[in-house]
């Protein structure tokens, strides 16, 4: 892969991270306040939602960082190394973590949708869960293929 492709992908990673950062800055406080309005009898719900949404952003940004590292390994011609396998494994774990967090939060999504009569809230939660699982499965497949390619490469290096 030429350097221009990896530069494009690195820019794409940054452009993926910026809107999520904007959502964390501007939308998360509004969602937390909105949840406090929906559930006035639960005083701490605002802070739980606030912390919960920020905690789910941590594995997202860690996965972006790992993808950035993976592209750097490709630039350095270290794509077929244990470092790349480890980066893919970390991306897989981050995607699974995001799915678990949002699956655990689905009852709150359901309650918010029920009170507000907006089923789109549930759909948003499901899209996040399934997109994260697709990324996890894709990363797992790539991890396995890369590990097999590394094994084949090391076997070929030994036979020469």
Swiss-Prot record:
A GO cellular component entry from the record:
plasma membrane
Report any Pfam family annotated for this entry: DUF2975
Q: Which UniProt keywords apply?
A: Cell membrane, Membrane, Transmembrane, Transmembrane helix
Q: Where would you find this protein in the cell?
A: Cell membrane
InterPro entries xref list: DUF2975
Q: Where are the transmembrane segments?
A: 7-27, 48-68, 95-115, 121-141
UniProt main location, coarse: membrane
What is the topology of this protein in the membrane according to its UniProt annotation? Multi-pass membrane protein
In its UniProt entry, what is this protein called? Uncharacterized membrane protein YoaS
Originating species? Bacillus subtilis (strain 168)
What lineage is on file? Bacteria, Bacillati, Bacillota, Bacilli, Bacillales
């Amino acid at each position: 892969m030429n350097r221009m492709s990896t530069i494009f992908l690195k820019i794409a990673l940054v452009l993926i991270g910026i809107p999520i950062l904007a959502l964390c800055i501007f939308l998360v406080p509004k969602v937390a306040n909105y949840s406090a309005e929906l559930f006035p009898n639960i005083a701490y719900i605002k802070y739980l939602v606030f912390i919960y949404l920020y905690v789910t952003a941590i594995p997202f940004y860690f996965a972006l960082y790992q993808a950035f590292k993976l592209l750097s390994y490709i630039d350095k011609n270290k794509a077929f190394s244990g470092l790349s396998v480890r980066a893919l494994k970390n991306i897989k774990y981050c995607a699974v973590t995001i799915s678990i967090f949002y699956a655990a939060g689905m009852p709150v999504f359901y309650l918010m949708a029920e009170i507000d009569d907006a089923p789109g809230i549930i759909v948003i939660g499901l899209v996040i869960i399934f997109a994260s699982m697709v990324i996890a499965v894709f990363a797992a497949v790539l991890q396995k293929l890369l590990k097999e390619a590394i094994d084949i490469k090391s076997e070929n290096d030994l036979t020469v």
